[in-house]
Amino acid sequence: MRIREIEPIVLTSKEKGSATWASIMIVTRVITENGEVGYGEAVPTLRVISVYNAIKQVSKAYIGKEVEEVEKNYHEWYKQDFYLARSFESATAVSAIDIASWDIIGKELGAPIHKLLGGKTRDRVPVYANGWYQDCVTPEEFAEKAKDVVKMGYKALKFDPFGPYYDWIDERGLREAEERVKAVREAVGDNVDILIEHHGRFNANSAIMIAKRLEKYNPGFMEEPVHHEDVIGLRKYKASTHLRVALGERLISEKETAFYVEEGLVNILQPDLTNIGGVTVGRSVIKIAEANDVEVAFHNAFGSIQNAVEIQLSAVTQNLYLLENFYDWFPQWKRDLVYNETPVEGGHVKVPYKPGLGVSINEKIIEQLRAEPIPLDVIEEPVWVVKGTWKNYGV
């Protein structure tokens, strides 16, 4: 089936989410010449307009191509775009189109994506909670919300306890972070994993001080402890602590991912299918990780189409650690966008079996919330911060 049309669609609503980027989605609709429709999702962050335009540009390389030839199509664009391995916009655009292509292939063959990739290794995918700590500042606020998360059935939760600290952290920042982590650990007990998010914003010396301060609380991993591009700092960090490092959401190619894995710089790989290259590249990096005894925990923060495809890939990942889950903290419209999405039960989600993504798309929601691409405001609290947490407390 040849691709006839590719359309980027920006969705937004007055109902906001737990972070600035949560109020928007960039959906990509691919239509074949015989009318089959597939859906993908791209990453908005602060680059809504540029990503929207990138999808339009990348589409020119896909129109008229056989939708089933995902490997060939991806490498054709890799050949055309000299900067694909360095362009976030290009990478997320090609990822969205690739995901939609796999959705179509599954529908054509009457099988969910996990069956196309060799079949599932599990019926249920273990997940961890994120987005739950909106407006938490004091240790007590973190602890109370953490208890609520555990009551919902989650066996693991992630949070950023560092407030407004960036690059450097001082004794006050270390103390506040420790008090928050201690409060959460005491609230949830020792049988729930706590995962520490750094958002890749510290230099190596600060990250090492953080690790030494928090290691007593037995975190399951330390996510992006140093600035993404600071490979030297990451080596220094790895040599200074036994804590496991998780990273990968900002990796945008197979070879870049292979470097981090094969150099021993990561213990838990967090590829994001909406910017790594979709299912086509995603299936490759899973195997690279498995061959190097690295676990996988897909980054899964943006929208319900991403959530659907990453459940499918998690189902076939033998070396899966956990899947990130914002679903319970999505604005309602993101949940209404899909039918058949499976809820979290006992810290797991069931793997859906509908052809393609495993879910159906609510076309009415798309038409109701369709909007022109607009720039997001740049405010004091960065776009990646869970809202209301970019604060100190006390004196």
From Swiss-Prot:
Organism: Saccharolobus solfataricus (strain ATCC 35092 / DSM 1617 / JCM 11322 / P2)
Similarity comment: family membership: Belongs to the mandelate racemase/muconate lactonizing enzyme family. GaD subfamily.
Temperature dependence, free-text field: Optimum temperature is between 80 and 100 degrees Celsius. At 80 degrees Celsius, the dehydratase is stable for over 2 hours, but at 90 degrees Celsius its activity is decreased to less than 50% in 2 hours and its half-life diminishes to 120 minutes. At 100 degrees Celsius, the enzyme has a half-life of less than 40 minutes. The activity is almost undetectable below 60 degrees Celsius.
SUPFAM superfamilies reported for this sequence: Enolase C-terminal domain-like, Enolase N-terminal domain-like
Enzyme class: lyase
Listed InterPro entries: DgoD-like, Enolase-like_C_sf, Enolase-like_N, Enolase_C-like, Gluconate_dehydratase, Mandelate_racemase_C, Mandelate_racemase_N_dom
Coiled coil: none
Active site: H199, H299
pH dependence: Optimum pH is between 6.5 and 7.5.
Keywords carried by this UniProt record: Carbohydrate metabolism, Lyase, Magnesium, Metal-binding
A GO term, aspect molecular function: metal ion binding
CDD domains: MR_like (cd03316)
Identification of the protein by name: D-gluconate/D-galactonate dehydratase
Additional detail: D-gluconate dehydratase activity is lost after incubation with phosphatase, whereas no such decrease in activity is observed when the enzymes are incubated in the same reaction mixtures without phosphatase. Analysis of the amino acid sequence of D-gluconate dehydratase indicate the presence of several putative phosphorylation sites on serine, threonine and tyrosine residues.
